[in-house]
A protein has these predicted regions:
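A sequence/structural signal for flexible, mid-protein segments enriched
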Residues: 1-173
Length: 173
């Protein structure tokens, strides 16, 4: 995991006694691979204001204009990516993405106090199919309102209704 925060752009709004900060963080993430296995990962940037303030605003998101990796699928449901790792492929163990951070608040110290992280979640193929089906329901990509409904993926064959399992880690930025 390597991240490179670029120099933040700061705009001052003296009439409101506020600043607006925009910063790009370039991330190269090496994903674990297993032989003869199809692994899926959810990648979700998160940000947390350490001191809740009604007049402050902070957001972090994947920059969709950045070069898209064909293994990554945008999931607006989680404001992140679903990545399908290709087992046994040379040179495809890592993924590069660009995060865009925006902050509106009183001062630069407030921006620097933000807790930014990248949540990486390893999920089963069944759970990946579930997320994709939910994304298709939420964003039907041009389906007519009166077309056949899309069903959410389910795994009821075992009788337990378990979609899949996951493990996650939060990587601080």
């Amino acid at each position: 995991f390597v991240f490179t925060p670029l120099e933040p752009e700061v705009d001052e709004w003296p009439e409101e006694n506020k600043i607006f900060v925009r910063q790009i963080i370039e991330v190269e993430l090496t994903l674990p691979t297993r032989d003869n296995a199809q692994d899926f990962f959810l990648i979700q940037p998160t940000i947390d204001l350490s001191v809740p303030n009604e007049e402050a605003y902070a957001e972090i998101r994947v920059n969709w204009e950045f070069d898209q990796d064909p293994r990554a699928e945008r999931l607006s449901l989680i404001d992140g990516l679903l990545v399908q790792e290709v087992a046994g492929s040379i040179g495809l163990e890592s993924i590069t993405l660009e995060l865009e951070v925006e902050y509106y608040g009183e001062n630069l110290e407030g921006y620097e106090a933000l807790s930014k992280s990248l949540q990486v979640v390893a999920i089963t193929p069944e759970m990946a199919a579930y997320y994709v089906s939910l994304e298709n329901i939420q964003n039907p990509s041009g389906f007519s309102l009166f077309s056949e409904p899309l069903l959410a993926y389910t795994n009821m064959s075992s009788g337990y209704g378990c979609f899949g399992v996951y493990r996650s880690i939060a990587l601080p930025l």
